[in-house]
Regions:
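Pyridoxal 5′-phosphate
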Residues: 1-406
């Protein structure tokens, strides 16, 4: 892997001054920053390659199509899908989950059941609530304990022949816990259920192998993987994607259209109606190239060192409350905490005055906050460009906030 200084040099935003302080960006769980290698791919596309893709006979259209489909292959190889046609470009993880939920909402009936976990992001709860409302199916919830660890014993009891879909996150966006999705998938398949995994928080830190996991659907967002916003991908097993009805109608997703009926395009285009985010897809491919240039194993190892260092430092602060699994081998580089007697929003405001960007609130995971009976947490989430020195400054900032607000 490059040196930390070389990596940081790839990210121009890290040279920003915020409130007269050098930017310390610890909000990577919300979105990661973008390296010049990805920015340059975006500039190159709009400068020299901009055209609508597919069906165009002119050179520019064919070049743009080739770049877009090459990016799809990069996503396929990164996640080890069998075919590039099993990779759908979407607007992001939320869009991907809604696509699957809409499809199964049309296939399910009263008496069927969907299982999610108590740890989910709202994007993996609300689409299934809507699907259940439309179909008459029921929503069941895997409980968690005080560490945010899912109760697999109760999960097994929830599973039955009525279970049609299990939809769970790979990594908690609020706590950083890595869930045992291998076991969750295997148990669901025993009863004939399909499994969707929300991989938004896992993909930047781990390298999920969809074939090894035997997962049915896996959803990710590019903007959490050093790529642009507004684009992501959904992996789906070919045989399951063929069973699902189209999510949206329009151009590109059809074979033939007449007023009596229409027939639909082959995968993946059946689910890609309209002009896609062409530049976003190409830039997503560039972001994957960037991550591989650093090494996925190396990224994970370095971020884990940051996590361990930060947790050890935080534990020295009197009055701090830490959330999440205490076994840091089962965590990504996400830390949720509170200071006793201090609202998380106030802590975040003080840190911002010091140039430190963190996320405060419920992190689109209100059921977790309800479990802990708190309004929210302060969340610091690290990426490969963060440093131990930044963590030291962060710790001093927390101490300053505590002195000012307690």
């Amino acid at each position: 892997m490059k040196s930390i200084n070389e990596i940081r040099a790839d990210f121009p935003i890290l040279r920003r001054i915020i409130n007269h302080k050098p930017l310390i960006y610890f909000d990577n769980g919300a979105t990661s920053q973008t390296p010049m290698q990805v920015i340059e791919a975006i500039i190159a596309y709009y400068s020299y390659e901009n055209a609508n893709i597919h069906r165009g006979v002119h050179t520019l259209s064919q070049e743009a199509t080739d770049l877009y489909e090459q990016a799809r292959i990069k996503v396929q190889k990164h996640f080890n899908a069998r075919k590039s046609s099993e990779i759908l470009f979407t607007a992001g993880t939320t869009h991907s989950i809604n696509l699957v939920a809409s499809g199964y909402g049309a296939l399910m009936k009263a008496g069927d059941e969907v299982i999610v976990s108590a740890s989910e992001h709202h994007s993996n709860i609300v689409p299934w609530q809507l699907a259940c409302q439309r179909s008459g199916a029921s929503l069941k919830v895997i409980p968690m304990d005080e560490r945010g660890v899912l109760d697999l014993q109760t999960y097994e009891q929830l599973l039955s022949e009525r279970t049609k879909v299990v939809s769970v996150q790979h990594v908690s966006n609020a706590l950083g816990n890595i869930h045992p999705i291998e076991a969750i998938i295997e148990k669901a398949h025993r009863v004939g259920a399909v499994v969707l995994v929300d991989g938004a928080q896992a993909a930047p830190h781990l390298q999920p192998d969809v074939q090894a996991l035997d997962v049915d659907f896996y959803a990710v967002s590019a903007h959490k993987m050093y790529g642009p916003t507004g684009v992501g991908a959904l992996y789906g097993k070919e045989e399951l994607l063929l069973q699902l009805p189209p999510y949206q109608g329009g151009g590109e997703m059809i074979k033939e259209v007449c007023f009596e009926k229409s027939t639909y395009a082959d995968l993946p285009y059946k689910f890609e109606a309209g002009t896609p985010n062409i530049c976003g897809g190409i830039a997503f491919g560039a972001a994957i190239d960037y991550m591989h240039s650093l090494g996925m194993t190396e990224i994970a190892a370095y971020e884990h060192e940051l996590l361990v260092y930060a947790i050890e430092k935080l534990k020295t602060i009197e009055g701090i409350v830490l959330y999440g699994n205490e076994d840091l081998s089962k965590r990504t580089a996400v830390i949720s905490f509170n200071l006793k007697g201090v609202h998380p929003y106030d802590v975040g405001t003080i840190l911002d005055k010091l140039g430190i960007a963190v996320r405060t609130g419920h992190h689109c995971a209100q059921p977790i906050m309800d479990y802990y009976q708190i309004p929210g947490t302060v969340r610091a989430s690290f990426a490969v460009y963060n440093t131990f020195e930044e963590i030291d400054t962060f710790i001093e900032g927390i101490k300053k906030a505590q002195q000012m607000l307690s």
